Amino acid sequence: MFPEKFLWGVAQSGFQFEMGDKLRRNIDTNTDWWHWVRDKTNIEKGLVSGDLPEEGINNYELYEKDHEIARKLGLNAYRIGIEWSRIFPWPTTFIDVDYSYNESYNLIEDVKITKDTLEELDEIANKREVAYYRSVINSLRSKGFKVIVNLNHFTLPYWLHDPIEARERALTNKRNGWVNPRTVIEFAKYAAYIAYKFGDIVDMWSTFNEPMVVVELGYLAPYSGFPPGVLNPEAAKLAILHMINAHALAYRQIKKFDTEKADKDSKEPAEVGIIYNNIGVAYPKDPNDSKDVKAAENDNFFHSGLFFEAIHKGKLNIEFDGETFIDAPYLKGNDWIGVNYYTREVVTYQEPMFPSIPLITFKGVQGYGYACRPGTLSKDDRPVSDIGWELYPEGMYDSIVEAHKYGVPVYVTENGIADSKDILRPYYIASHIKMTEKAFEDGYEVKGYFHWALTDNFEWALGFRMRFGLYEVNLITKERIPREKSVSIFREIVANNGVTKKIEEELLRG
């Protein structure tokens, strides 16, 4: 069982949940993903579903209802995202700031953002959206929820990233997202402004959600359905470095401009972390084959170690080989790690795929982890979800243990399953929380568990087909319909601060 102050919550993002109002007053056309999912070429090639986010669940108008549903589940925490493109639908690039540049490694060591800068930003910010997000956060706080605010969940403002043009011009356009160092500077401005406007009601911040997904699927997997859909390892390297750099700058800006405790029991006014997936959950196909073992080690370092060594130790693996590090103390700064866990990876060795990224000597094995056929059994005879992800709860334990190596508090910030018929979800929830308990009992403290998700939502390139919600959503009426078995199981676990013997006997034994 978990302690009394353990955080039980749900997680959501902006783009996936907000849109769907009948009159289309609250759509956000100023984001790269808005343009990406409706691109004719993407739809014709089957890279995206053709579903459109403006047909979505309308959390923008129905947030009070969703908060009340969460309260009745017994939850005490809620993770939300703020959409950069809603706050700044227009460019902030003309607002000048001084910055120091490390010419040896093309990284920005510091950005000088002042109160005058914030006042300039305030003049062009969308006040309606600032007021909206304050209303959302205050709604949560009034119901007793601890709020985590995440600043970036895959999307970028369209004025920074035109993914169609980036693809067609092979990233030579100016609006080329994380390949461009100006995105780093603009992110620092955005983070400073959000801390300035919301610091009085927020104490827990995350800079990014799963930054390596943006990099790997956008620049190394052109058929993934993620923008900009190019194969360019040099661009991938730049994007990784720039997102590490952006985290570090945002960390310092949030600390600088959020100086007020929102909650009396908070450790400090601003606890700034990062939400991350695939932490230490790559396993060798053959544990007795030294090459497969090394492939798994490289996979784990590429997906999490590369980022974490930089932001926790100030050590940057500039050659992307897992061995050659430079001292970059200006990149150091992170207060907590959010573990997002869904399934494992099983990998085998292959010769380096890209000469400029020596770490990529791993190849996923079909039939395990993320690489399964939906609705079947994996090669390990484990159930597989609607999205084709194997149920492997042991990976939750391993991911928590790996995250603990960096000496900061750990939270489970996403965990869930695409299961439209609610057949596998009850077992999934119970088994993964049980593994979280096991980690806690073994001395690896976990401070919270956030389920993905309260409701069905827009699953990026896959649209509305993948149903992750504890509550089904009718996309016509927007009605929230409980998936009774899972809702009951989760409510009972939350009420008892852990998996009860009754649930264990019903779902986890035999």
Curated annotation (Swiss-Prot):
Keyword terms of this UniProt record: Glycosidase, Hydrolase
Temperature dependence per UniProt: This enzyme is thermostable.
Pfam family, one: Glyco_hydro_1
Active site: E210, E414
Primary enzyme class: hydrolase
Name of the protein described by the UniProt record: Beta-galactosidase
GO molecular function: beta-galactosidase activity; beta-glucosidase activity
Secreted listed as a keyword: no
The reaction(s) this protein catalyses: Hydrolysis of terminal non-reducing beta-D-galactose residues in beta-D-galactosides
Gene3D superfamilies: Glycosidases
Enzyme Commission no: 3.2.1.23
Keyword Acetylation belongs to the record: no
PANTHER family in the cross-refs: GALACTOLIPID GALACTOSYLTRANSFERASE SFR2, CHLOROPLASTIC, GLYCOSYL HYDROLASE
Superkingdom of origin organism: Archaea
GO biological process, one term: carbohydrate metabolic process
Family: Belongs to the glycosyl hydrolase 1 family.
